[in-house]
Curated annotation (Swiss-Prot):
Pfam family, one: DUF520
Family to which the UniProt record says this protein belongs: Belongs to the YajQ family.
Organism: Burkholderia multivorans (strain ATCC 17616 / 249)
InterPro entries referenced in this protein's UniProt entry, alphabetically: DUF520, UPF0234_N, YajQ-like_sf
One Gene Ontology term, aspect cellular component: cytosol
Annotated function: Nucleotide-binding protein.
The name this protein goes by in its record: Nucleotide-binding protein Bmul_0741/BMULJ_02519
Keywords noted in UniProt: Nucleotide-binding
GO MF term list: nucleotide binding
Higher taxonomy: Bacteria, Pseudomonadati, Pseudomonadota, Betaproteobacteria, Burkholderiales
Amino acid sequence: MPSFDVVSEANMIEVKNAIEQSNKEISTRFDFKGSDARVEQKDRELTLFADDDFKLGQVKDVLIGKMAKRNVDVRFLDYGKVEKIGGDKVKQVVTVKKGVTGDLAKKIVRLVKDSKIKVQASIQGDAVRVSGAKRDDLQSVIAMLRKDVTDTPLDFNNFRD
Protein backbone atom coordinates (compact mmCIF):
# COMPACT_ATOMS: atom_id res chain seq x y z
CA MET A 1 0.00 0.00 0.00
CA PRO A 2 1.65 3.28 -1.11
CA SER A 3 2.25 5.90 1.57
CA PHE A 4 4.20 9.07 2.36
CA ASP A 5 4.91 11.31 5.35
CA VAL A 6 4.04 14.99 5.69
CA VAL A 7 6.76 16.74 7.72
CA SER A 8 7.89 20.28 8.40
CA GLU A 9 11.59 20.61 9.05
CA ALA A 10 14.22 23.17 8.08
CA ASN A 11 17.59 22.09 6.71
CA MET A 12 19.78 23.08 9.68
CA ILE A 13 22.99 22.90 7.64
CA GLU A 14 21.63 25.54 5.27
CA VAL A 15 20.45 27.62 8.26
CA LYS A 16 24.00 27.52 9.67
CA ASN A 17 25.43 28.53 6.28
CA ALA A 18 22.97 31.44 6.06
CA ILE A 19 24.00 32.59 9.56
CA GLU A 20 27.69 32.48 8.63
CA GLN A 21 27.03 34.45 5.44
CA SER A 22 24.95 36.98 7.39
CA ASN A 23 27.71 37.50 9.96
CA LYS A 24 30.25 37.94 7.17
CA GLU A 25 28.11 40.56 5.42
CA ILE A 26 27.38 42.37 8.71
CA SER A 27 31.10 42.53 9.52
CA THR A 28 31.92 44.11 6.14
CA ARG A 29 28.99 46.52 5.74
CA PHE A 30 29.72 50.20 6.25
CA ASP A 31 26.54 50.94 8.23
CA PHE A 32 27.55 48.30 10.82
CA LYS A 33 31.09 49.69 11.20
CA GLY A 34 32.05 49.66 14.89
CA SER A 35 28.79 48.05 16.00
CA ASP A 36 28.36 44.80 17.90
CA ALA A 37 25.75 43.38 15.50
CA ARG A 38 25.85 39.62 14.95
CA VAL A 39 23.79 36.43 14.74
CA GLU A 40 24.55 33.48 17.03
CA GLN A 41 23.17 29.95 16.84
CA LYS A 42 22.67 27.38 19.56
CA ASP A 43 20.86 24.27 18.29
CA ARG A 44 17.47 25.49 16.99
CA GLU A 45 17.72 28.89 18.65
CA LEU A 46 19.16 31.94 16.90
CA THR A 47 20.01 35.13 18.78
CA LEU A 48 20.23 38.43 16.91
CA PHE A 49 22.34 41.15 18.56
CA ALA A 50 22.45 44.82 17.54
CA ASP A 51 23.12 48.32 18.86
CA ASP A 52 19.54 49.56 18.50
CA ASP A 53 16.13 48.57 17.14
CA PHE A 54 16.86 49.92 13.66
CA LYS A 55 20.08 47.92 13.33
CA LEU A 56 18.26 44.85 14.68
CA GLY A 57 15.81 45.21 11.81
CA GLN A 58 18.75 45.47 9.40
CA VAL A 59 20.32 42.30 10.87
CA LYS A 60 16.97 40.52 10.51
CA ASP A 61 16.69 41.65 6.87
CA VAL A 62 20.21 40.40 6.09
CA LEU A 63 19.45 37.03 7.71
CA ILE A 64 16.15 36.65 5.83
CA GLY A 65 17.88 37.50 2.54
CA LYS A 66 20.63 34.96 3.10
CA MET A 67 18.11 32.28 4.12
CA ALA A 68 16.07 32.93 0.99
CA LYS A 69 19.20 32.58 -1.17
CA ARG A 70 19.94 29.21 0.47
CA ASN A 71 16.34 27.99 -0.10
CA VAL A 72 15.41 27.97 3.59
CA ASP A 73 11.78 29.00 4.03
CA VAL A 74 11.53 31.97 6.42
CA ARG A 75 8.18 30.67 7.72
CA PHE A 76 10.27 28.30 9.87
CA LEU A 77 11.38 31.30 11.96
CA ASP A 78 9.44 32.18 15.11
CA TYR A 79 10.47 35.61 16.44
CA GLY A 80 10.56 36.31 20.16
CA LYS A 81 10.26 39.76 21.70
CA VAL A 82 13.06 42.32 21.52
CA GLU A 83 14.99 42.60 24.81
CA LYS A 84 17.27 45.39 26.00
CA ILE A 85 20.67 44.14 27.22
CA GLY A 86 22.30 47.21 28.72
CA GLY A 87 22.85 50.63 27.23
CA ASP A 88 21.21 50.89 23.85
CA LYS A 89 22.02 47.32 22.85
CA VAL A 90 19.18 44.93 22.05
CA LYS A 91 18.78 41.24 21.27
CA GLN A 92 16.04 39.06 19.86
CA VAL A 93 15.69 35.31 20.15
CA VAL A 94 14.46 33.52 17.03
CA THR A 95 13.41 29.87 17.18
CA VAL A 96 13.58 27.57 14.15
CA LYS A 97 10.37 25.53 14.15
CA LYS A 98 10.53 21.74 13.81
CA GLY A 99 7.87 19.18 13.13
CA VAL A 100 4.17 19.34 12.42
CA THR A 101 2.41 20.76 15.49
CA GLY A 102 -0.64 19.04 16.95
CA ASP A 103 -3.10 21.62 15.62
CA LEU A 104 -1.58 21.55 12.14
CA ALA A 105 -1.58 17.74 12.13
CA LYS A 106 -5.28 17.70 13.02
CA LYS A 107 -5.95 20.26 10.28
CA ILE A 108 -4.09 18.13 7.71
CA VAL A 109 -6.00 14.98 8.73
CA ARG A 110 -9.31 16.89 8.53
CA LEU A 111 -8.42 18.30 5.08
CA VAL A 112 -7.53 14.83 3.80
CA LYS A 113 -10.76 13.30 5.15
CA ASP A 114 -12.91 16.16 3.83
CA SER A 115 -11.36 15.87 0.36
CA LYS A 116 -13.21 12.54 -0.21
CA ILE A 117 -10.04 11.04 -1.77
CA LYS A 118 -9.73 7.36 -0.88
CA VAL A 119 -6.72 7.66 1.46
CA GLN A 120 -6.14 7.41 5.21
CA ALA A 121 -4.19 9.95 7.26
CA SER A 122 -2.78 9.25 10.71
CA ILE A 123 -0.73 11.38 13.10
CA GLN A 124 2.61 9.79 14.01
CA GLY A 125 4.62 11.97 16.38
CA ASP A 126 5.66 15.13 14.55
CA ALA A 127 4.65 13.78 11.12
CA VAL A 128 1.42 12.79 9.39
CA ARG A 129 1.41 9.49 7.46
CA VAL A 130 -0.91 9.35 4.45
CA SER A 131 -1.56 5.97 2.83
CA GLY A 132 -3.85 4.88 0.05
CA ALA A 133 -4.44 2.22 -2.58
CA LYS A 134 -3.33 4.26 -5.61
CA ARG A 135 -0.28 6.41 -6.20
CA ASP A 136 -2.43 8.92 -8.12
CA ASP A 137 -4.59 9.48 -5.03
CA LEU A 138 -1.48 10.25 -2.97
CA GLN A 139 -0.24 12.71 -5.59
CA SER A 140 -3.59 14.50 -5.59
CA VAL A 141 -3.39 14.73 -1.76
CA ILE A 142 0.08 16.31 -2.05
CA ALA A 143 -1.25 18.86 -4.56
CA MET A 144 -4.25 19.61 -2.34
CA LEU A 145 -2.09 20.11 0.79
CA ARG A 146 0.34 22.40 -1.07
CA LYS A 147 -2.62 24.53 -2.14
CA ASP A 148 -4.53 24.61 1.17
CA VAL A 149 -1.79 24.75 3.84
CA THR A 150 0.12 28.00 3.28
CA ASP A 151 1.00 29.15 6.81
CA THR A 152 3.63 26.43 7.39
CA PRO A 153 6.13 25.00 4.89
CA LEU A 154 5.46 21.30 4.34
CA ASP A 155 7.75 18.61 2.96
CA PHE A 156 6.65 15.25 1.65
CA ASN A 157 9.11 12.42 2.14
CA ASN A 158 9.37 8.68 2.76
CA PHE A 159 7.27 7.98 -0.36
CA ARG A 160 6.81 4.21 -0.54
CA ASP A 161 5.12 2.00 -3.06
